[in-house]
Amino acid sequence: MNLPYETLQRIFRDLAAEEMSQSRGDFSISESSREWTAETTIRDRDERGAGSIGVDSLELIQLATRMSEYFGLEQFGIGDSLLRGKTMGDWCRMIHEVMEPAWESITVRSSGTTGAPKTSTHSRQNLERECRGWETLLGPVQRIVSLVPAHHLYGLVWSCLLPASIGQGGLEGQGGLEVIEARWETALRWLGELKSGDMVVGFPFRYQTLPATASTFRVPAGVTAVSSAGELGAQEWEALYRLGFHQVLEIYGASEAGGIGWRGRPEADFELAKHWQGRREELNGLPDRFEWTGKKTCRLLGRKDGWIKIAGSLVDPKAVSALISQHPLVRECSIRSNSPDAQAVQGHPSGIRLKAFIAPVQTGLSTKDLQGLAKVLRKWVEPQLPPAARPVSYEFGACIPRTAMGKEMDWNRSVDHHDVA
């Protein structure tokens, strides 16, 4: 597959934005990266923002290492050349030159916001096979409207590789379908720009605003909506169909395995994608639990590791709890999902967030004092955690709620605590 230069530039931009966001703890970088172009400088710190990524000497090596890992550049020996590149365009051109004639694999990291990310390498052959399988599910597609980052595996396949494959009649050709980036647009804006034959590539959190729109708006005929990175909630399913989407596909996938299954109705089991049929035993090592309902169908029963998917990102509640427990005013902290069914499904309702229960060091605090402590903690975690991993509510008590056997339990109105959310 010869990725168009413009596609590679999108991947580079989103990959660089994620790397710098996580490195600096500044999660506004993703927003400013929308203005990055081929002329955006790499190292000019005085112009950091839209005009420059503004890396220092250590970040420069970090960025080159991430690009080398993702695109498999070690085999091409261009590491030193990358370090000499002055602009984003310089870097993209060098990568494109070595990727264009031949490439073997792409290495992605898990979409976790907490804990150490895991890397997974996907061969060119497997990515091509996955694209061919998804094409058989789709009707005629004229354009892609992307609401997702291009560098995560779901975005890579559905907003980069699949458009290239459909538009080229195969991944060896040139060109590809037009991709409209609508990541930073409101729902009303991108809905209003849809044309017949479009395919929207999104995820549950982005579709969450649609129910309020569905009563007054209709999309053109023949438009498809695709969703992944978490369970599509019942309200979102209903809204998509009421808006007039011709086809809705919910994709189940994992960073370790790519796209695994799909369904076209909220009550349906997931059907294995064509490229996984006959190979389901290879899925046993995934972090998700399955209930097989047939040779090609399964239900998803949640993750084995207790992580929670929020707005497309995996969050480790234990890691968040450990961080907040380090604050000098906190004696104990417990973190849970605000949905009691968060571990009952593979994905989660699109409105799911984290809540925190805090046992302060100082006891006997007034409601006003606790409200002040909640503000302090919110401000303290903001630079240390990405939005998906930040608790949206704080409750306080003398000790963490536990069962008679000492196991942490969810808190409710029967527990003696103060809700200062």
Where in the sequence are the language-model features?
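AMP-binding/adenylate-forming catalytic core of the ANL superfamily
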Residues: 287-389
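Conserved C-terminal "lid"/linker of ANL adenylate-forming enzymes
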Residues: 355, 379-421
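Conserved ATP-dependent adenylate/AMP-binding module captured primarily in the ANL superfamily
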Residues: 126-145, 184-198, 212
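Conserved AMP-binding A3 loop
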Residues: 105-132
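ATP-dependent adenylate-forming carboxylate-activation enzymes
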Residues: 147, 168-194, 315-319
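Phosphopantetheine-dependent thiolation modules in NRPS/PKS and related acyl-activating systems
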Residues: 1-106, 125, 407-421
